[in-house]
Swiss-Prot record:
A Gene Ontology molecular function term of the record: serine-type endopeptidase inhibitor activity
A Pfam family annotated for this UniProt entry: Kazal_1
Organism: Mus musculus
Organism superkingdom: Eukaryota
Keyword presence, DNA-binding: no
Lineage: Eukaryota, Metazoa, Chordata, Craniata, Vertebrata
Name of the featured protein: Serine protease inhibitor Kazal-type 4
Domain Kazal-like: from-to ranges: 31-86
Span of the signal peptide: 1-26
Length: 86
């Protein structure tokens, strides 16, 4: 009986820990979002106002305008991964 209880405990404890990890991971999921570039003219002069954003290409951009400019120049689908530095 004690051996059976021990085996059940060894089986359940790792599962409980895994559930907690999944909940923490799910709570911190980051989904990319599209930058608002439609209003921009061809190759605009971007303001130098620092408002750092992290692109899905892994690069940090000074602001959304700079990310849009890179999208236009490279024709790549770079999105905003998160606000702030990568």
């Amino acid at each position: 009986m004690a051996m059976h209880l021990w085996l059940v405990t060894l089986t359940l404890v790792p599962l409980l820990g895994m559930d907690r990890e999944l909940m923490v991971s799910a709570g911190s999921l980051v989904f990319p979002r599209m930058p608002f570039c439609e209003h921009m003219a061809e190759l605009p002069n971007c303001p130098q106002t620092p408002n750092l954003i992290c692109g899905t290409d892994g690069l940090t951009y000074e602001n959304e305008c700079h990310l849009c400019l890179t999208r236009m120049k490279t024709m790549k689908d770079i999105q905003i991964m998160k606000d702030g530095q990568c």
